[in-house]
Amino acid sequence: MERRELLKMVALATGGVVIGGELFLAGCKSKDVEVAGTAFSADNIAFLDEVAETIIPKTTTAGAKEAEVGKFMTVMVNDCYEEADQKTFHEGMKKLDEACNKMHGHSFMKAEPAHRKELLTSLDKEAKEYMKSKKKEDPNHYFLMMKQLTLMGYFTSKPGLEQNFNYQQVPGKYDGAVPYKKGDKLFV
């Protein structure tokens, strides 16, 4: 799977454009100077793992936490996002926790799975409405960033790829008529 194809799939799945997509296409470049306030703590990574696990929970396949999506998000935000989007992402983590406190009376980390799902569903609707009226100069919605990074991190991870797709590590000859039955995994 090529990077462009993945970006198209993530954009279609989240109903918008991929935030920072031009940087992903060009390749991420680490900055020599770390932007003030963008360091992620172990607690931040655990928080992002829980957000990602709520979006892609463990079922018969690995969940986002098992794929270490929280760690993936931190690398992508620090190395690939512009400073404005980094700031939005960090502030968004706080906003998400505050929204959980407002909706359920406790932090996201203490919330039950049903409360987490309810919160993220409402944030997803909010993000979609925001994107309908967003102007180019407006900041991106923090939840859309988290959701896109969750999908990208999960489906490019080893457990996400191998357990959800018919992954063939060594390419064979081209066969344009591979038999496919409903319910089979996609070939990648």
Model region roles, listed by residue range:
Residues 44-75:
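Post-signal-peptide N-terminal segment of Sec-exported extracytoplasmic proteins
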Residues 1, 5, 21-55:
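C-terminal segment of N-terminal export signals and the immediately downstream linker at the start
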Residues 34-39, 56-58, 78-89:
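A ubiquitous short alpha-helical element
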Residues 40-46, 63-64, 135-142:
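Structural motif
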Residues 9-12, 54, 79:
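Membrane-interface junctions
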Residues 50, 68-188:
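Mature-region segments of soluble proteins
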Residues 7-27, 112:
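N-terminal export signals
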